[in-house]
Every structure is written in C-alpha cells, then in structure tokens.
C-alpha cells in the first residue's frame, strides 16, 4: 500500500491542526476521482470528494488542539510537531511508501525527521507542494481540510463568529480583539504561543498603561 499525508490549519491562530493520511492499494484506485489540492476546490467539491475518499480508501486523521500545540511548542518546533503527527498517521496506515508534503525548507531533512518517529520500515517521499503533484496527497489534503472546517464550525457554534481561524482573516482578528478586550486573556481556542496573540496582548497592555498615565 502507498499513502499520502498532508495537514490543514498549521498556520491558524485559532482552533486545531488536522493531519490526514490516505492509503490506497494502487494509484489506479483514485485516478478517476478528479483530485486536486484542496485549496483549488470549492467547499462543495471538497465535501463530495471527502465522502468518496472515505468510502474507497483507508483514512487516518489526527486532530491537535490549540492547547496541545502550545504544549508541544514548549518542547519542539512546529515543523517537528507536524512531523510527529505525520508519523502517527503513517503508522496507523502501515504503507510501504508514504508521500508527504514537506514542512521544512529541506524536504530530505523532513523525510528523515518523519522516519525517525516510525518504528516500522517505510519509504518516505518528501516534497514541497506534494499535494499538487501526487493525487494520494491531494486526497489527504482534502480529508484534512474538510475535517478541520468541521472542527472550526463546531467551535463557531460555541464561541461565535471566529472566522477561518487564520491571522490573515479580519473576522478572526476582530474576534480575538473583542475577546481580549472583554476577558483580558486569549480565548481557550487560541494558540497562545503564536506571535499574533502575544502582539495583541502587548497592544492591550500598552493601551491600558497609556490610559492610566
């Protein structure tokens, strides 16, 4: 079996990161799916393909919460955290070859990092933009994206309009600003180790000091 591995939400300031692996006996199994990188697909296309992939392929996912990411980052880099999670889904699928989207400027080094977390032999093919090159990684990208979108939807029901969770999203930043204004601390779903959060907190502290004096 071969598998593809990708993640969604790596750079998000709110909510979890999702790592997904998709295993197939051969690439012919998914040749007719019309797979592409999840970012090139509409939400409805992703949902349709998600159902098809889950039905026809072996799938493994790992969901890492914001609090867990903060805890990991006290001990390792984010890239190492992703590599560990990639290894977890690879171990669950137990393929002979795993294609991974490299989370390192050096894809060969990233392959070695992932391999170091595996206890069973597996050939790791690590490349940048693997989600655009290998359909099996595109499939993993779709599973990761849809799974994360569903997790964000659950959080929005509980916490209100949080946007996509990414620092580039004005709705996400507006939510963070409003929450910190009211509670003086970041929300539980925020990655407190992110510079976005520390910068907003620093601005609020500076603003409070200025008004005091």
From Swiss-Prot:
Region forming the signal peptide: none
Residues that, per the record, bind a divalent metal cation: 6-7, 101
Biological processes, Gene Ontology terms: DNA replication, removal of RNA primer; mismatch repair
Chief location bin: cytoplasm
Cofactor: Mn(2+); Mg(2+)
UniProt-listed Enzyme Commission number(s): 3.1.26.4
Highest rank taxon of the organism: Archaea
InterPro entries: RNase_H2_suA, RNase_HII/HIII, RNase_HII/HIII_dom, RNase_HII_arc, RNase_HII_hlx-loop-hlx_cap_dom, RNaseH-like_sf, RNaseH_sf
Stretches assigned to the RNase H type-2 domain: 1-206
Localization in the cell: Cytoplasm
GO terms of molecular function: manganese ion binding; RNA binding; RNA-DNA hybrid ribonuclease activity
Family assignment from sequence similarity: Belongs to the RNase HII family.
UniProt-listed PANTHER family: RIBONUCLEASE, RIBONUCLEASE H2 SUBUNIT A
Record-linked NCBIfam families: ribonuclease HII
HAMAP family: RNase_HII_A
Protein task: Endonuclease that specifically degrades the RNA of RNA-DNA hybrids.
Protein's UniProt name: Ribonuclease HII
């Amino acid at each position: 079996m071969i598998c593809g591995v990708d993640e969604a939400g790596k750079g998000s300031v709110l909510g979890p990161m999702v790592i997904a692996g998709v295993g197939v006996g051969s690439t012919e199994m998914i040749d007719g799916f019309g797979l592409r990188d999840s970012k090139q697909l509409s939400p409805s296309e992703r949902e349709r393909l998600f159902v098809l992939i889950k039905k026809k392929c072996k799938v493994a996912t790992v969901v890492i919460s914001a609090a867990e990411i903060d805890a990991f980052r006290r001990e390792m880099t984010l890239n190492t955290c992703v590599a560990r999670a990639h290894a977890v889904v690879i171990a669950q699928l137990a393929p002979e070859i795993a294609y991974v989207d490299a989370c390192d400027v050096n894809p060969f080094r990233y392959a070695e990092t992932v391999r170091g977390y595996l206890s069973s032999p597996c050939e790791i093919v690590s490349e940048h933009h693997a989600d655009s090159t290998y359909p099996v990684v595109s499939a993993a990208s779709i599973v990761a994206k849809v799974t994360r979108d569903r997790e964000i939807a659950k959080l929005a029901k509980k916490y209100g309009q949080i946007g996509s969770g990414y620092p580039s999203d004005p709705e996400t930043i507006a939510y963070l600003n409003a929450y910190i204004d009211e509670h003086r601390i970041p929300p539980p779903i925020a990655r407190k180790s992110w510079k976005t959060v520390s910068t907003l907190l620093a601005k609020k502290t500076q603003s409070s000091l200025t008004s005091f004096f």
